[in-house]
Amino acid sequence: VALLLSNRPDAGALGRARALGVETLVVDRETFRDGDRVAGLLARRQIDFIALAGFLWLLPPELVHAYAGRILNIHPSLLPAYGGKGMYGDRVHRAVIEAGERESGITIHRVDEVYDNGDVVARYRLEVRPGETPESLAARIHELEYAHYPRTIEREIMKL
């Protein structure tokens, strides 16, 4: 990991990254909207691959094009179900439970110019248990994310 970029100055990952000697940057929405500027910032740091986690802003088209096929995102549902703008975190888990779904999981996908729309790289499933709450489902989904996202990122980077 060469750089951790966040839109939230209070993100816990920033402190963890700094403690490991990883450069960190916090960007505001106005700066981030300039996709050419962000792509240039990343190129100057020789960033070859982008992995998103908990980043809720739609990426500017210029950035998506500059890193076409080299941006991954993780989503806490089996896309295309429960994806799209505004569907994140507990909102997803609550919707899954309220719909009576019998399974949920995570989707790791390439990023394009539409929320949660890119080509699926991997899906991992789990059973929604009777009596499941959004909080208990979130905890189990996080376990899937921690187990599979780093390995999937590594596998995709090795293909470059």
Named regions from a protein language model:
Residues 1-160:
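One-carbon transfer enzymes
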